[in-house]
Amino acid sequence: MLFRSGYVGYGVLDKKMKYGGEVEYTLNPSRSAKISYAYQNTLKEVGSSMNFNLFEEYGKNFVATRFEYIIENKLEGDFHISRPLKLDVSLSTKDVTPAYTYSYKGSPLLNYRSDDVKLSLRYAVGEKHTMIGIYRTVTFAGNPVFTFDYTRGLGFRENSFTYNKIEASADFVAYNRLFGQTNVRIEGGYVDRSLPYGLLFSGEGSKGGNFSFILENTFQTMHPDEFLSDKYANLFFKQNFGAFLFKAKYFQPEFSVAYNIGIGGLRNASDHEIDFNVKKHPYQESGLIIDNIIRIPILNLVYLRLGIGGFLRHGHYEYDKFEDNLSLKTSLKILFK
């Protein structure tokens, strides 16, 4: 089965068109085996690490301050080796133009190329599927879920780079009748040599201006491009106690506490002439979230759930003024009935 998609957009601030498209062919529906070719000419946040879902990607771009223009050609194939194990292999060529002023190893870096092969594995314990027509649909996402990404920079074109990059994550969910739901995510990454800014790890923070959303698995009090790393390890913890105080049709507040911590490192930091910090010491923050303050049904299909959260930066990287360490955010979730 052949599937086609595409998009066209226009940037009001940079006055440039963004566009892309994808052609996908399903080889074996029962194993979700497919191959695809995608092209895009777009703008993306510099140094993003593990994959986010669509809403989180939009949220990250909303608060990000450093971007790159990317022209990419990508050939990709993926399938389920077994019910819980999925394999994805891709070959990508990118022409990258930083939309920020930056010098690398003493020379201005106006553009570069990034050509790579990437292998991704996802293992979801207990994941369940069903076939709806010719489509394989996930009915239970699995718990815990492990991911592993290996990227090999090929460096076969001029002004491109050879490197090895690894990222891995583990997500755990536990339920308790008295204490509610516990979510834990552990993630880390490593690059084996000095590379330009956009090929390293940054963008772990999601603190915006006066208005921003809570984005899961990011640091809510950290500015998007505050730190730069070629190695990192993060832990995100959230305890949701549920709606134990009030329950009404449009008002079912759920109380949660959160604690996030991360550490990183960067070799040859002097190679990069741009403002950043290195996360040599643990970065810590804690938060209180009230989800589902407003619960709005839409078309009898989903609930739009609005809430609020407050997070406090503390430890080695806290600021002198209390208000600078505080981040107030809006919680937005969509839940199917």
Model-derived features: positions:
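Exposed, low-structure sequence patches enriched in small/polar residues
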Residues: 1-337
